[in-house]
């Protein structure tokens, strides 16, 4: 399998940025840990601040973290009775927050990252890759999306939410699943493209909802096989016309592309409104984002 780690090695320190990571599957999930390693190898400064437990489907819920219960953190990654927040014993960049995804990324943005970076705050927020897709009716309830929209709207930090159709919850210390490696490489490609486009990385109050298709060692098995499609989160039947792209002023629906046509190795990238998590219905803003992503975008046949 070829890897975008080759691309990562080419990222100069001048392009390296400060990144905060979170998710809703838990801080010790293999997907986010694999992505952390890839981002670190690319030369970025990365702080991971994720929930102590699986918080899937919690949307934009937010409450102060509490002492970890007697069961401990997910995947036995911290013992029962641990403090409300904590860090890996050997790597202070890896942090848990015993609360919701929004609370977790907020802790990372406001407390943990500035503490590790001499007061500096993140320049980019990345959530996921989520275990499972986040399309259509799933989007408003997704903690992965909720954390990204908090970063984009409240913290005013450009944010990207990543989700992958394949895989089951896996501990950080289990053998790294094939899907985690592929999704980390694909997520790095999107991230690097946005960074290389220059600041501001995204228009204010917008986020990207990125979904990866099902992968296996026999189908969609190499990063070079994937095509990135610019899509909508919702269908847009009653919305104003979209940006003029790929010969149309109506972007394809991400659910149709990822769930029905995903076997063609399509990655969907949808521009989201951080205020309500739906598609950003502004053709001019969509065009700005298209221009940033244009080096990797393709059109559907």
Q: Where in this protein do the model-derived segments appear?
A:
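Fungal secretory targeting signals
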Residues: 1-17
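Structural recognition of the beta-strand scaffold that forms the well-ordered cores
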Residues: 18-22, 46-50, 96, 123-128, ...
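A cross-family phosphate/adenosyl-ligand binding-site feature
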Residues: 19, 29-110, 116-117
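Solvent-exposed, acidic/flexible segments
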Residues: 25-32, 98-102, 137-144, 176-184
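Solvent-exposed loop/turn segments at secondary-structure junctions
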Residues: 25-28, 52-57, 100-105, 130-135, ...
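Extracellular/periplasmic catalytic domains that process cell-envelope and extracellular macromolecules
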Residues: 40-41, 87-89, 117-120, 153-154, ...
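Internal, conserved structured core segments that host functional sites
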Residues: 108-109, 113-167
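Electrostatically charged, flexible surface regions
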Residues: 174-301
């Amino acid at each position: 399998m070829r890897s975008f780690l080759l691309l990562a090695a080419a990222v100069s320190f001048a392009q390296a940025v400060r990144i905060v990571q979170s998710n809703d599957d838990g801080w010790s999930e293999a997907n986010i840990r694999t992505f952390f390693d890839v981002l670190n190898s690319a030369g970025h400064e990365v702080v991971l601040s994720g929930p102590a437990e699986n918080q899937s489907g919690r949307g934009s819920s937010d409450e102060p973290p509490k002492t970890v219960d007697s069961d401990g953190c997910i995947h036995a990654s911290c013992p029962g009775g641990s403090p409300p927040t904590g860090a890996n014993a050997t790597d202070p960049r890896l942090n848990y927050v015993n609360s919701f995804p929004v609370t977790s990324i907020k802790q990372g943005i406001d407390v943990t990252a500035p503490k590790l970076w001499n007061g500096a705050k993140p320049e980019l927020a990345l959530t996921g890759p989520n275990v499972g897709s986040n399309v259509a009716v799933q989007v408003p309830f997704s903690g992965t999306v909720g954390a990204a929209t908090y970063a984009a709207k409240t913290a005013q930090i450009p944010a990207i939410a990543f989700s992958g159709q394949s895989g089951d919850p896996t501990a950080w210390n289990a053998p790294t699943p094939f899907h985690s490696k592929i999704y980390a490489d694909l997520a790095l490609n999107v991230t690097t493209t946005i960074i290389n486009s220059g600041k501001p990385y995204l228009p204010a109050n917008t986020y990207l909802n990125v979904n990866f298709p099902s992968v296996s060692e026999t189908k969609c098995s190499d990063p070079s096989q994937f095509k990135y499609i610019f899509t909508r989160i919702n269908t847009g039947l009653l919305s104003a016309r979209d940006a003029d792209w790929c010969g149309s002023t109506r972007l394809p629906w991400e659910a149709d592309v990822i769930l029905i046509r995903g076997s063609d190795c399509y990655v969907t990238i949808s521009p989201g409104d951080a205020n309500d998590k739906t598609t950003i219905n502004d053709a001019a803003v969509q065009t700005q984002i298209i221009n940033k992503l244009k080096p990797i975008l393709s059109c559907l046949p």
